[in-house]
Amino acid sequence: MFLWVKTRVIAAPGFDPEKLGDAVCFVMERPGLTDEAVLDQHCLEADRPPPSAGLHVPGLAESSAVVFLRRGGRRLFRRSAASDLPRLERIVRAVGNGQPADVTLVPVAIYWGRAPDKEGSTLKLLLSENWEIAGRVKRFFQVILNGRSVLVQLSAPVSVRERLSEGLDPHLTARKLARVVRVHFRRQREVTIGPDLSHRRTMVDQILRSPSVDAAIRREVEVNKLKPEQARERARGYAYEIAADFSPAVIRISERVLSRLWDRLYDGIEIGHLDRLKAVAEGNEIVYVPCHRSHIDYLLLSYVVYRNGLACPHIAAGLNLNLPLLGPILRRGGAFFQRRSFRDNPLYAAVFNKYLSLNLAKGVPIEYFIEGGRSRTGRLRPARPGMLSMTVRSFVRRPVRPLVFVPVYFGYERLIEGESYLSELSGQAKERESLLGLVRGLKFLRSRFGKVYVNFGEPIELAGLLDEARPDWRAEAAASDERPAWVQGVVRDLGSRILTGINSVAAVNPVALLATVLLSTPKRSILETDLLHMIELHLALIEGAPYGPGVTCSELTARQIIDYGEQFGLLQRRTHKLGDIIWLQERSAILVSYFRNNVAHIMALPSLLACAFFDRPELPVADLKGTVSRVYPYLRSELFI
């Protein structure tokens, strides 16, 4: 089987197999020959005895080192609800008696293809694991169809000895352990593959049946003198225009295609602070709010999240990307489309609001760009309130589960849209997205674009923000269906916090450092020795006076950064007997100003302090504080510091 099956193992943060010891028992949700074989193979590859060999330590002799929380019985049509609770209780009693001193329980979840369930699916009924025979048939086809995409998740180990210290008797301790792990598995499944998803048709029907959309349809009939059937069909058309058509098969194929694309385009993807995301992924509604630098952003975050064992987000994309051929693929990858403005279309607004609200209530991870469009300068754009306002209002009306915003920073060393941005900044009109433009853009596949950086910011809990702004918001929302006016203030504050959160996890890469130094020199040229000194100064400032704990910086030395810039085709060298001169061509200077602007906020305060001493060697502390207090608020507002 393992000539065909390919597994990827993801362990919980801090998981150290060397510290597990010899007395280890794995916990799985349900039995299955293929799952047990995968676990055995993983243990053998990790130089551990396979669980099927049993658990044999002083005081314990079990035929298997696996506890199943739900076991299949021998009924023909239905699986029994029996479990391995007696085995778990024997283990707990043995530890309680001191032989062995402790047993470590390791929850293990194995996913074949990671396909979310679909409500109302005939295929789900036919292949449901609630039917013993069908369950085996389903697993056979899963091995054949999804054997190349198997994810093994090892959760944080649980000490039986520590659980016994709570003072419960062995029977109750075993039951509590089983219940806690069972809840963990359910949450982990949702985090990994996403919640149950409706068919697109079912989702559209839910939207049209909702009171808010029904009221909007009636208003449409009155205002535009339509027949009720016409207004309803118009609403249905809007819903189909908006809704994603999520396909796990497209996600799996996209992962393979994108892996090869990234290998062709980039020299690696650096991921920072992923632990922050994993810490809040379980049990929360996640809304990813990244900065918007490139069209690659749409693909990059989904790829990074999926590769690290989390469910792909549904992404809000502009209707301009709903192109022939491309649009359906994006839609099946989780994209849902929105018009640039729908303030004057109440029916469309009602349909879109309900679609977003239903997805948030189901726990579907969402991604959208609060800047509204891609930055052409490299600096963050002010937050647009539209999607944030809809999200906050939806949560206030129906807080089904905690909602957490996760800021995400994207850093590039070269953009595939660089030339088009250059044209736009030169005054040319923005080129509209089209299929022909997409085909012409494929020429970038011949180029290299350096490294990509994806950093996750500190999560922002919406409920906490609402509690600060309006302590009685829950009671007010329950008592009235009106849109509370105070929400707009929360939305403005939230937008500012998200942008500040993005900047707080910026990635200072070699291109950004070189651009920062060279663009501040006359004629974009400098002696190599001076360039080395200036890069070392910037690195020392970033390390010695850090902007924040989330900022990541290149680990290359100043010399290596210059070498990198030359190999990357960014720097030019002119030899001279008094010392080589390093310079930027004019065209390169315009392009790399984008990457200097990515990190301008990091050097803003040191630069302000340096400017205060520009024409004097000394300055009283009071005068320095006065200068900073007058200028800094403008910098903070402009650069989202």
Model segments located where?
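Membrane-interfacial terminal anchoring regions of lipid-handling membrane enzymes
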Residues: M1-I641
